[in-house]
């Protein structure tokens, strides 16, 4: 038992979100412990960051410090911030402290876990790389995800990032019996609200039976103090770890936005008086990123596959924030505005998206060869587009005309109707297995369907649907 009397202190200084607390005895709280300030009408939780000597600690607040004053009473909880975990978290929205913020009453979770935990030991890790099938053709075929890997999601506003995220949440639940945790790190409150509304509409969150929902949401939005934005990723990760380690499930962890996590760490670092590093970032940037990323992995029990939205400041890939993130990524999914404007969804760029899994030793020679042929065909089409724009299709050689024809079919066949978009499009969603994708594209590139019209390949699932659609168009 913690001797509460010896674990109380008083505020000696407040500088914005940073609070210095003096403890009367030498019994100081540990670094990363949560301490609670009693401000009369509200309780403010802070996290201890530094031990200053002379019985003083420096802590960073997780909520606003408005209304706090020197001399206010502070209690050490004896442990890091502890958040609820398990099935009761599904369908709910939490803040960094694990408190529900969706006005649906308390979360009746039986257990809680501290947000600061060690990464799985080396002996617990799964060492054989395996592909995580998503049911989305363009992803599985050209930039496959690693089970327990980290994927960077690049894309501006309005190119379909949210819909892709929701489809992945839906597919992991159906195909893998898994769940998802969404960590909104320093994003707009409006976006968080829109995502919640869209998830309810597409039944990713089941309002009638919350336990049937497929996702738990954790938000630390951009109006919150830097301490909350810095730790909300760990709160989401802790909830995901429980599903992996205790429920032995495959989990998808979305972090939107990993850059805001770095940005919040930079703010906290400056507030704590650390000497800034390159471009003004915190000197501990690589360590902070490593602590978060090393906990995202596959174990012998289950896996956490993480999809992280990556913002590139001023499109500078050498900026320390994206550069540090890239070191941890296994795959990148790049969304293209050009494809979105053509109406090809998901607007994943087949030439810019990459994956370390796309090796013949891992995915097999047939998959690898098919992916390379698709990329070569699309690359040739891209090179010919300038000539087509100036001189027209008729000026191309017979071979090039055939390449262009097949490339346009490939481009359209990479589109796919989504389950979560059924509400908007009216066409039923499709989950396409990897084997069906490989078979379909192989036959297409071998010239088996050169006589079928382009539009028969647009927004269909497997190749048989394209054949049926072509027959319907002719009929």
Swiss-Prot record:
A Gene Ontology term for the protein's cellular component: chloroplast thylakoid membrane
UniProt-annotated location(s): Plastid, Chloroplast thylakoid membrane
Known catalytic reactions: ATP + H2O + 4 H(+)(in) = ADP + phosphate + 5 H(+)(out)
Keyword field contains Membrane: yes
Enzyme class (EC, first level): translocase
UniProt record, GO biological process: proton motive force-driven mitochondrial ATP synthesis
GO molecular function, one term: ATP binding
Primary location class: plastid
Enzyme Commission number(s) of this protein: 7.1.2.2
Keyword Ribonucleoprotein: no
Key words of the record: ATP synthesis, ATP-binding, CF(1), Chloroplast, Hydrogen ion transport, Ion transport, Membrane, Nucleotide-binding, Plastid, Thylakoid, Translocase, Transport
Entry binding sites for ATP: 155-162
Membrane topology: Peripheral membrane protein
PANTHER family documented for this protein: ATP SYNTHASE, ATP SYNTHASE SUBUNIT BETA, MITOCHONDRIAL
Quaternary state and interactors: F-type ATPases have 2 components, CF(1) - the catalytic core - and CF(0) - the membrane proton channel. CF(1) has five subunits: alpha(3), beta(3), gamma(1), delta(1), epsilon(1). CF(0) has four main subunits: a(1), b(1), b'(1) and c(9-12).
Family recorded in the similarity comment: Belongs to the ATPase alpha/beta chains family.
Function: Produces ATP from ADP in the presence of a proton gradient across the membrane. The catalytic sites are hosted primarily by the beta subunits.
Protein name, as recorded: ATP synthase subunit beta, chloroplastic
